[in-house]
Amino acid sequence: IQIDDERTLVAHACRHPEAFAPLYLRYFERVHAYCYRRLGNPDEAADVSSIVFSRALSSLHTFRGESFRSWLFAIAHNALTDHYRARRTEQSLDDALECHDGQRSPEEEAIAHEARRTVTSLLAELPAEQRQVMELRLAGLTSKEIGLVLGKHANAIDQAQHRAMIRLRGLVTGAGSTTGDWR
């Protein structure tokens, strides 16, 4: 779907809610994967994803035409924040490498599970802003879209991602972060 097509679909869905289906079908898997990575629980991810699309449908009239994906992920970001507040527990991360297709051997599953645990623990070492940037990048958003979600300029997102990658590289090689402001 091109941006102009999305705008047309959004405008049509404002008048006819059943026309929201193509937008839902296009973005559900991405939003659900993002929620799952943030929550680590498939049931909670499904619940929050449902809330995201419910809010999106009821708030279509507020969409201003930039990028529907950015707008939708901003709703997802806010829904997750609300979920964490309601749950009052520390945010958990999961599964930055999710790609289970049912075709892997038990050994491959074990390796994939360990890789997910490693990525999760590495991401948990990042400052909150860098972690959010990396999670949204893993969800497939561009720097501009991440900026719209987090209320920052694309250049600031690129810098945060660069710093996160340097920090992750240091963590992987055992050097950790030795210089710089890692916010």
For each predicted feature, which ranges?
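Internal acidic/polar
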Residues: I3, D82, E90-R116, T142
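Short, Lys/Arg-enriched C-terminal cap helix and immediately downstream tail that follows
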Residues: R85, L126, M165-R183
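A short, charge-rich alpha-helical start-of-domain segment used by transcription regulators
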Residues: V10-A33
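Hydrophobic positions on the alpha-helical face of helix-turn-helix-like DNA-binding modules
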Residues: V52, I75, V133-M134, I146-G147, ...
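Short amphipathic alpha helix immediately N-terminal
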Residues: Y24, E125-E145, V149
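Arg/Lys-rich amphipathic alpha helix in sigma70-family domain 2
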Residues: R37, T62, A74-D94, A112
